[in-house]
Structures are given as structure tokens and as C-alpha cells.
Amino acid sequence: MRFFERFKTTKLKLEAELIEREIHRSKRFGYTFSLLVLEVTNSIPRGLSKLLPGRTLSFHTLQKNLRPYDKIVNSLVRRYYIILPQTNKIASDKIKHRIYEMAEYYKWGDINIGIATYLDDGNDAKSLIKAATELLEDYSYRDFNDETTIQLARV
């Protein structure tokens, strides 16, 4: 158990460091960025996979549908952070819905996504991670398959 706690702490430090780099860049150039926390449920066998697409959530499919400069950070076994530079709350919400559409199309199963935006939800890495984690939304197909769903434009 002690090993897992140390591993978890080390991983969170690495993620916080990447988020802090993006915060410094945002301060320097005067723009915001968003942090998406993507959590996959137990219905996906091994989470996000670079090697085993198909039964798992494919890293390449997710990366292909994001912008080239968006960063996907592998956190723990079933949680991933997506850093979206130069993205405000509205654009990150559209990206979240695009990920939900991909989950439905590729039959990934249920996923949860939380969003935090720099300056709106926090000024440092810890507060952004905490805000996004608290806002994890449960996703199920019946909630998303509604005629009033927003038409998603590529951001």
C-alpha cells in the first residue's frame, strides 16, 4: 500500500508540473486554458491504450480528434488529464461533448469528464485539478441522445 501511495504522489507531481508550465505560458501571453479530467469507468477493461485499440479507449482516436497541441497526460489507472491551451469554458464544453460523441460512436462505455478553466476556476495546478475533479459528470448514452443536443463545431 505504501508503494501505491508513493507512486500516486509522484504521478500527481508530474501532472501538476505540466499544468504549472501551461499556467506560466498563459500568464506570459495573456490567455486562458482549460483542463479536462477524463475518468473512465470499470466498463472499459484497461482504460486509455496506445497499444490495444478496440476493446479499450484508443489513445490515437482521442488524439486525432483533438488539436495537435493539446496534451493528454496519463495519470492513474483510469484517470487522464487533457490540457487545452488557448481554450475558454465554452470551447472546452464543446470539446467535452465531442469526446462524449466519440465514446458513443466507438462504444467506449461510460466516461466522466470534469472541466476547469484557468483564472475562472483556479490560479494554480492544485486548485485546477481539484475544481475539475469535483465537477466530474456522469455520462450515459440516454442522457446524450437527445434531439436538443448542441451541434458540435470543430474548435
Where are these predicted regions, by residue range?
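Active-site-proximal structural segments of metal-dependent nucleotidyl cyclase/transferase enzymes
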Residues: L18-S49
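Short coupling/linker segments associated with nucleotidyl cyclase/phosphodiesterase signaling modules
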Residues: R2-I23
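Short helix/loop segment flanking the catalytic signature motif in cyclic-nucleotide metabolism enzymes
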Residues: P45-G54, I82-R98
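Conserved helix-loop-beta segment at the catalytic/binding core of cyclic-nucleotide signaling proteins
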Residues: H24-R28, L57-K89, E101, Y105-W108
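Heptad-repeat coiled-coil signal-transmission/dimerization helices
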Residues: E15-I19, L52-L62, K96, I129
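A short glycine-enriched loop-to-beta-strand structural element that forms part of the catalytic core
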Residues: S34, N74-P85, K107-L135, D146-Q151
